[in-house]
Amino acid sequence: MKKELNFWKMLKIQPDIYRIFFVFIFLIFSTNELKAEIKKPNPDIKPREVIEIQLNALMKNDTPSKDHGIIQTWFFAHPNNQRVTGPIERFKNMIKTDSYSMLLNHENYEIVEVYKSKGVSTFEVTIMDKDKKYYKFKWQVEKYELDGFLKNCWLTTAVSQPMPMGSSI
């Protein structure tokens, strides 16, 4: 009984240590939860699905955290694309420019395949942005052929500048 009292007494004496401990544990689990929400490339994901993953993420860019959609999109960018558009902070800034900002928090999209070969697929993507304006893009994905964790994964190699298509109003 005396040992049990000492334990509770110790908790009262050192509450700050325990608060710090619980905050630390909470942060660890929160960080892992955010990481778990990022979809990673794998060979089972088809070309169209790559674009759907990217567009769905950009549609809700700041959910569950700031720029989550842009980060998700980055994960499916081909390494050659990342070399040109990265690092990630530069990629975030590029997406937020007038050239691509209409992708952020857009209302809906349509994807039409226009070309397919063994290792390359090209799609015409039409989005309606949050201001009800339509834009069309050419979106190209390629199968990554080099050894490593991305082998046989479909990844985005190019997204054209948008072509304004007018308003829905």
Language-model regions, residue ranges each:
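Low-complexity, polar-biased intrinsically disordered regions enriched in Pro/Ser/Thr/Gly
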Residues: 60-66, 147-148
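Exposed beta-sheet edge and beta->alpha loop/turn motif
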Residues: 114-169
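Short, aromatic-enriched amphipathic alpha-helices that serve as compact interaction elements
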Residues: 46-62, 72, 76
